[in-house]
Amino acid sequence: GNFDENLVYVNDIEIFRPLLVRNAQQEGLSFINSDMVGDIVFSSGGFDAKYGDKMSSVLDIRYKKPQEFGGNVSLGLLGASLHLEGLIGSRFTYQFGYRRKTNKYLLNSLETQGEYNPTFNDFQVYLTYDINEKSELAFLGNIADNKYNFIPETRETSFGNFYEMLKLKVYFDGKELDRFSSLFGAFMYTYKPKKDLVLKLITSAFSTGERVNYDIQGQYYLSETGLGFGDDEGLERGIGTYIEHARNNLWANIYNIEHKGVKIYDNGNLSWGVKYQYEFIEDRVNEWKMVDSSGYSIPSLPDNIGIFDSVFSPQLNNVFKSNNAIASSRLSAYVQKQWIFSYDYGQWYANLGLRAQWWDYNKEFVPSPRASLSFKPNIKQDILFRFACGMYAQSPFYKELRDEKGNVHSDVLSQKSLHFVLSSDWNFTMLERPFKLMSSVYYKHLWDLNPYYLDNVQVRYMAKNNAVGYARGLDVRLFGE
């Protein structure tokens, strides 16, 4: 899936990610701080009903509870990090992590040459306090401040085939100044009235302010490279200028409260949960682009500069202006039951769950049934086989509601997928070290898709459920020490 189609959890808390960010170049630091991680579970599909409403995959992270004092410091050309952990008395544990990163040296290898100055800063804290033998209180906090400053200079690209190779060279003026700042905090109260019953209450808040500003002029020169037969090297094909302008600002506040529970039986367990989420998003878009070919601003198709076709209605320039504010509420709930059947030849695990969600903005209610069957044979090898299937509905977030011109559409529905996944987990020892091989084969039928295109690695949606598709593949991962 793309940047928006994957779930990320830390200690049962769903993590939100920037909305305007351009994937890979500007994301910088992911939320996950590897120094604080105790366990990782990843599923490329067919995940349980207890996980949320995304189409593609889920990454479930568990931050550890330290048993003693420790820490580490890392320094390098691409950044630095500091991590401290420990406990105070027998009830209170803490983890602190600070990270600073720059990928300017990596970005300097891109086709667009210039002065890249991205800086990403992140501070996280995870605290736990054992109130008594039955109760625990935990806090997870994060402060992130990401800046992406870029002054482009030149870009050179070659394309075509053996008989006609073309070279495009662009000289730039201007710069881009982006900033993404966010605050995240979550409290989790865990209560165990009995050994076979666990109850959790989770509340969290996420606030982000995102700014994308740029004024960039590019003067381009298109020529032949002379690699084909009989071509004149350096023959000019065309010159022109284009200007891109943006003043985009977005503010988002997301609050939620959630209850989860697990009842353990001799032959399985029962899990349930219910969640309420309130969102307020304010967005201001002011973008335009002008293309000037040889001194003339002529109407043209976006993908065929200088070619006019009266069948279409091309725009003289691309102008996106909007001022949107959305307040909405979401409700979701799930219940799932696991059965364990033991025989002489092995153990069977059956899991059946139902998840449902409702959003008051588009008035859509979507149920999502999910099921899985696993088998662990009684043999010397520690191996588990699993088949899973289910329906997954990704309710649109603000980004999916906004079309390429900045207009917001309230009739956009959830994107839906049907998963079929066959997987295996094999734990073994090699070179006197523990290893784990995880593999899966999957097929996903997709419908009510909201098409998007990549604009300089930024995902821009069409805000229409007018596509179908599929995803299929083989996923193999090897873990070792």
Each model region followed by its residue ranges:
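Structural signature of Gram-negative outer-membrane beta-barrels, strongest in the C-terminal barrel
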Residues: 252-254, 267, 275, 319-445
